[in-house]
Structure formats: structure tokens, C-alpha cells
């Protein structure tokens, strides 16, 4: 099985404190979320965590878009 970077690690490459882009804002906020599942790759587990704990995420569609970018970058 090939090594795959965690979603969190990928998301951190999208940070940009000067950007108003939804994914950049998600990444900026996730950086400060001390309980974010940093080693997780699984969509369902990440989605459940975010739905229950990420008040900083304005819409799950932002996560969906970021996760698709993650998959595109892993292939």
C-alpha cells in the first residue's frame, strides 16, 4: 500500500491568512482546532468530526470541495 498524506497535512498546504477563499479560511481555522483528527484520511470520519465539532466551517460543501482537491492531489 502506497503512503498517503493525511487530509489535515494536505489542508495545511492550503492556508493563506490573506485570502478570502473558502478553502484557505477552512485551513486557517483548522490549524487552530487542537482536536482535529490530524492523521485521518477517511471522508466519512472527517465529515462526522466536522459536522459535530467545526463551528468555524460555514458549510460542509467547503469540506467536500477541499476533500476532492485532496483526492486529486493524491492521485
Curated annotation (Swiss-Prot):
Classification via InterPro entries: UPF0346 (IPR010673), YozE_SAM-like (IPR023089), YozE_SAM-like_sf (IPR036806)
Domain of life: Bacteria
Pfam name, any one: YozE_SAM_like
Disulphide bonds in the chain: none
HAMAP family according to UniProt: UPF0346
Family: Belongs to the UPF0346 family.
Protein name (record): UPF0346 protein LJ_1103
Native source species: Lactobacillus johnsonii (strain CNCM I-12250 / La1 / NCC 533)
Amino acid at each position: 500500500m502506497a503512503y498517503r498524506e493525511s487530509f489535515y497535512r494536505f489542508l495545511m498546504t492550503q492556508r493563506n491568512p490573506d485570502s478570502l477563499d473558502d478553502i484557505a479560511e477552512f485551513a486557517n481555522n483548522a490549524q487552530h482546532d487542537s482536536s482535529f483528527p490530524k492523521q485521518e484520511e477517511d471522508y466519512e470520519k472527517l465529515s462526522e468530526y466536522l459536522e459535530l465539532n467545526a463551528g468555524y466551517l460555514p458549510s460542509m460543501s467547503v469540506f467536500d470541495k477541499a476533500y476532492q482537491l485532496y483526492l486529486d492531489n493524491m492521485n
